[in-house]
Amino acid sequence: LVDWLYNKGVTKFDDMTNLSKDVRQQLTDNFTILDLNVVGEVKTESEDTVKFLFSLPDGRRIESVLMWEGKRRTLCVSSQVGCPLDCHFCATGKMGLIRNLSAAEIVDQVLYGQRFLRQRGEELTNVVMMGMGEPLLNFDQVLRAIRLMNLDFGAAIGIRRITLSTAGHVPGIKRLSEEKLKIGLAVS
């Protein structure tokens, strides 16, 4: 399953041809692949950035932003719907916190970005946790998502190619340091 989901990028269980028809039907009846529904896609005039607007199963919406810079393909992913902080430079805080994203909803953004790029013959090189929300206020799910992104048999994003951007939540930074992950940390 992992190979089909992460490496081959299938979006339907029926495409997993090495599984029996009965198993594929059971999977289809009980699970979904990529719960994000793309409801918008906006490219900049220079075409070096594209913003994806996703609808979640509960109807809430989140954004991810894909950026091209030289050989780098960086995806900025959301960790919350809204945000409890009210940073002056960020519109998301005006929404307030609606809810935290699950690790699966965070990783789904990465899988979508990988599929989007692979259709163009490109690969995702970097992930930054700096979309909607304060990642350190959704610590457990963000940490789980980072570990899933980094699995060799998963999304296979190198740990040093993952950056967490925070508004400076000190207790979260301290807790993150205890995890001994070698991700990047950006404070904005």
Residue spans for each PLM region:
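Residue-level signal for secondary-structure boundary elements
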Residues: 13, 35, 118, 184-185
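Conserved Radical SAM active-site core
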Residues: 62-183
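Extended basic-aromatic, gly/pro-enriched interface segments that bind polyanionic ligands
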Residues: 188
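Flexible, acidic/Gly-rich N-terminal and inter-domain linker regions that tether
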Residues: 2-73
